[in-house]
């Protein structure tokens, strides 16, 4: 059995993440929080849909589904039933650069959840039957969320091909259903072997636990798992676009045109402060009815019925490594107003670059984002996942806890610099417009 190594940092204070690593490479972060008699357990794997090679698109998301279909000592569907029987909740989520699984249960159910997570990290059960079932489930998700809705997946599905060029950055997380249907259990087993090693994961525990006893329990359940090769960390950076480009899609049944622009952001890890400033800039520029773009584009000039701006392709910053994009999206009453909306967005960026933000508006925007982060951290499951993401991507789980304070320290100069960088980007985006109707009454 593997014993936990000495913690990388002391955790004498309640609520301070304690970090350790098992001999098999599993990174562990334990955070005591005794506000409620509950505990959250999350496992974050260093694989997302950007890691999928061509011909295997959608594997990361499909595998997330398969991880709930049973493991070496847990029958099909039993993982969910055991968590729910303890009074808990669970879920899994697939992102561009990681996949996360989490449970929130009463504190006395901690051992049960650690056993469940260790068992599926050891050996998930993948059969022809479970694979066929989950491919059908994914197909229904695609129909419900993408193909069966006029604005399905907008803009995270349609925008990347206009902004990026590589397969890793342009394909969406659902992938090509033809790739999934052509796969077999051996293909998914190979995916597990490549990416689901203990050394490619972070286990986070947040809640009413004693950190020392929790560390011993983790070592008991996860320590026997053998170390396996860990893939080199993938890098998905690509050159900046050198020309403007707006892709146009004619969509049947679309009520109104929709525009999305994607502007390359600073590296979220390598240039943390630049990315942070762009996040606050998004709140100033186009987040809510008091934002600059809503005031000018929606209320005053009536160029759009809705406008939003913010860091992160999916609308949620801090979830990825480089590259990421700043997204400006709008619903316009007519196709010809979309270009005017783009002009107005760049004019607003140029004004912020030249004059900087109104100090009071900056204070409000930063405070709103900080409050959102505090509310996220106040939920055990969300904090456990945040610790997993930040430990995985930044090597510092506690950075998630410090993020609200870092947001509040954003200066007018940093906002102006962020606006200058974005205003200098080429216009890359996508326009959805109602498909022409043909024919009429006979």
Where are these regions (language model features)?
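Acidic/histidine-enriched segments that form metal/cofactor-coordinating
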Residues: 2-7, 45, 72, 79-191, ...
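Short acidic/His-enriched helical or mixed secondary-structure segments at domain edges of catalytic enzymes
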Residues: 139-158, 237-256, 299-308, 355-401, ...
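N- or domain-start disorder-to-order transition segments that initiate the globular core
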Residues: 2-37
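M16/MPP (pitrilysin/insulinase) zinc-metallopeptidase core fold and M16-derived inactive scaffolds
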Residues: 35, 40-104, 170-173, 288-306
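An aromatic/glycine/proline-enriched structural segment found at the starts
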Residues: 2-5, 165, 173, 197-198, ...
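C-terminal regions of mature proteins
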Residues: 2-10, 202-204, 352, 360-442
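Buried hydrophobic packing residues in well-ordered domains
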Residues: 25, 43, 61, 101, ...
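A structural supersecondary motif
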Residues: 260-264, 286-332
């Amino acid at each position: 059995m593997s014993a936990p190594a000495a913690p990388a940092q002391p955790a004498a204070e309640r609520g301070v993440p304690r970090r350790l690593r098992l001999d098999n490479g599993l990174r562990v972060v334990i955070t005591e929080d005794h506000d409620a008699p509950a505990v959250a357990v999350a496992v974050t794997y260093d694989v997302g849909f950007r890691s999928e090679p061509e011909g295997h698109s959608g594997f990361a998301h499909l595998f997330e589904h398969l991880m709930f279909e049973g493991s070496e000592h847990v029958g099909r569907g039993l993982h969910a039933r055991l968590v729910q029987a303890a009074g808990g909740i669970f879920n899994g989520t697939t992102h561009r650069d990681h996949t996360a699984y989490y449970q929130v249960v009463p504190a006395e159910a901690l051992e049960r959840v650690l056993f469940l997570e260790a068992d599926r990290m050891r050996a998930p059960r993948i059969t022809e039957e479970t694979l066929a079932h989950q491919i059908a489930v994914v197909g229904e998700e695609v129909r419900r969320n993408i193909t069966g809705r006029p604005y399905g997946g907008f803009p995270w599905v349609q925008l990347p091909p206009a902004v990026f060029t590589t397969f890793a950055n342009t394909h969406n997380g659902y992938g090509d259903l033809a790739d999934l249907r052509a796969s077999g259990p051996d293909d998914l087993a190979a995916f597990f072997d490549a990416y689901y090693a203990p050394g490619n994961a972070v286990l986070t525990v947040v809640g009413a636990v004693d950190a020392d006893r929790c560390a011993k329990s983790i070592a008991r359940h996860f320590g026997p798992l053998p170390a396996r090769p860990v893939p080199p960390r993938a890098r998905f950076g690509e050159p900046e676009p050198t020309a403007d480009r707006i892709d146009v899609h004619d969509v049947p049944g679309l009520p109104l045109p929709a525009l999305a622009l994607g502007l390359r952001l600073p590296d979220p890890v390598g240039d943390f402060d630049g990315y942070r400033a762009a996040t606050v800039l998004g709140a100033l520029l186009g987040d809510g009815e008091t934002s600059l773009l809503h005031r000018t584009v929606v209320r005053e000039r009536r160029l759009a019925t809705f406008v939003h701006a913010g860091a992160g392709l999916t609308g949620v910053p801090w979830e990825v490594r480089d590259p990421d994009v700043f997204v400006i999206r709008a619903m316009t009453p007519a196709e010809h107003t979309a270009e005017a909306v783009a002009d107005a967005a760049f004019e607003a960026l140029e004004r912020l670059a030249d004059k900087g933000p109104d100090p009071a508006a900056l204070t409000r925007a930063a405070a709103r984002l900080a409050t959102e982060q505090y509310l996220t951290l106040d939920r055990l499951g969300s904090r456990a996942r945040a610790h997993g993401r930040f430990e995985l991507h930044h090597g510092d789980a506690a950075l998630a806890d410090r993020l609200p304070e870092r947001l509040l320290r954003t200066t007018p100069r940093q906002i102006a610099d962020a606006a200058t960088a974005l205003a200098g980007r080429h216009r890359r985006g996508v326009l959805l417009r109602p498909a022409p109707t043909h024919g009429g009454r006979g």
